[in-house]
């Protein structure tokens, strides 16, 4: 028997001892988010949700720099489950994972896994698996089982099986029977499930001493069903049946599988057997089966099952009638479909738009359409006709027949020239039921024409609507104007705006801002200014995103001066300036015309009564510091503080970096004091600048002191910080100390670049410790870090190589490295 091996295992464990209490059904994918949060943490979670939901979002938001040190796993889990969109949750999770001092636990990973699984974001879910393994966080069997189920729900069977083995090998979790059941369930979620994999996992369970229960065999049954192993599936089913575990869920798996395999007769036989055992399938299963029978073109069996449902007292809903009528329509059984339609009416269930759409769209002959209309015409009123139109249009649109929807409306308006007269229109007119569609239906068709890139047809339809005495709604104009603007047709959109005004339809703020955005996209600041005059007439405000975009676009095209002039013209039209756009202009001037021009605009803005914000000050301070004009930046910094603005950590970092690069290390240190006074905590960027500056000033002991201070504040160094300290110590001749931090960097799996290796090598050579220097050199070569010829460190590598060639203690080893192809044959060693 195909299933004899599994049956034997079941019997063996049944004899060993009495079966323990059955494990609960695996946890639902809905996370228990009742973990207690302190009020301050709850407020923190809400603030993070607000920041990440706010548009536009920036990971450099000053508020995030303030909130990040307070992160913990409970807060992260709460925030993740507070987002309605998976993308925001994933953005937040990645941001949180990178914050210094924070480390995810399995609850946080499970929260993210559940969100990604429900959203079917498999690529991100795969990345999360790698992150879980790299984190080496310990987990309970239950938590691990939940993670496995999330992978299974997303169809990531290979990943679920792989992570199961890896976690077990790494000693992060000891799986129990529940964990194995979750893995089996995950495997069963995939239609391409491997029978061999399932049976291998069952053997592992046996070797671990775990019992097989209903929740073990149910996914096994599902796998056999998924893979079309009908005989094995029947064997498992019989085993479950013999143990008294048969329930509605298990029965549903097999009967639905029979339906999927096209074995409708066997499915029907199984249903009758279940009835004999007093196991009733639920209403949903009956509906699924009827749908499957219809899909298999077994309308006869579908109606037999339908009759069985009615005898059991199950009343069909409109969705089930829809499936049956759809099947009848597919087989062109018009009379039976109409008979069922009349039954719906007799039962008091109003036919919905889907059924009307199927009846009207499935039959194309004039006689058939006349027959349908004869059945429904007596019951339809104006509202029903509108419903019919809407159903027809939805059917047209669903089938990408937007042109047919357009022709139908033209027929209703008496325009028959192109495609002839619609038979439905004739029938409606014969019974005085023909009326024009309402504004909503017309708007749907116009919107679909626009989406189908048939803007010209939409314009024609709009004009015909006006000629027939209908007043188009603002939505119709907005849709067409938006479509024109997406195609860059700003002139035509302005013309339609004039027609809109002539028709007595007031444009909305959306209407004008669509055109404004189009003009901004084309860098047409003259046209944009003319449109602003129209906005002022209607009392609308231009969207700052379009103004800012236009300014940025002009600056990107090297027209920063035009951008500034445009902002002046905007103010001249009576619109209040916005610092976001002004800051964009300042930034553009700095990049195009230099820092002085940006500073000049900044002063003009202040002179005109505007109050620059923190971002505007930061842009200038950062630019001045980069230009080695930190003294001027300091004046601006003090000016900002005097106005009550709080500098961000990023602004402090710019100042500290500027002072350090100019050799004013003590002034940089004074900025640290001001940060603490301002209740701002230095971050890793702050300390990196300080450490680099202290080493450059010949104060390596103070650099190490700051390093230890940073780690003591749970601010952990990153790769750049390590490299700054190592290279700085090397320049100060502290090669031994630099090597210690180099090894620590390697332990943290941070990869040094060639500059770090060469700094160490050069430092050891300077102290005449050629053996230590050559050891580091060999490491660099073996790890493939020898710089290529275009690398700025290439000549330094050539120089140190020359020194090793000249030394008898290292030249022979160097020859071997060259022969092995690990370093290029340099001109300096070509004689070897």
Swiss-Prot record:
- Which keywords accompany this UniProt record? Mitochondrion, Repeat, Transit peptide
InterPro entries attached here? Pentatricopeptide_rpt, TPR-like_helical_dom_sf
Any single Pfam family the record assigns to this protein: PPR_2
Q: What is its main location?
A: mitochondrion
Q: Which PROSITE patterns match?
A: PPR (PS51375)
Describe where the PPR repeats fall, as residue ranges on this chain.
Answer: 105-139, 140-174, 176-212, 213-247, 252-281, 282-316, 317-351, 352-383, 385-415, 438-472, 473-507, 508-542, 543-577, 578-612, 613-647, 648-682, 683-717, 718-752, 753-787
Using the UniProt entry, state which stretch of residues is the transit peptide: 1-27
Q: Where in the cell is it found?
A: Mitochondrion
GO CC annotations? mitochondrion
Could you tell me which PANTHER family the record lists for this protein? PENTATRICOPEPTIDE REPEAT-CONTAINING PROTEIN 4, MITOCHONDRIAL-RELATED (PTHR47938:SF35), RESPIRATORY COMPLEX I CHAPERONE (CIA84), PUTATIVE (AFU_ORTHOLOGUE AFUA_2G06020)-RELATED (PTHR47938)
Would you identify the family this protein belongs to, as annotated? Belongs to the PPR family. P subfamily.
Q: What is this protein called?
A: Putative pentatricopeptide repeat-containing protein At5g08310, mitochondrial
| The organism of origin for this protein | Arabidopsis thaliana (Mouse-ear cress)
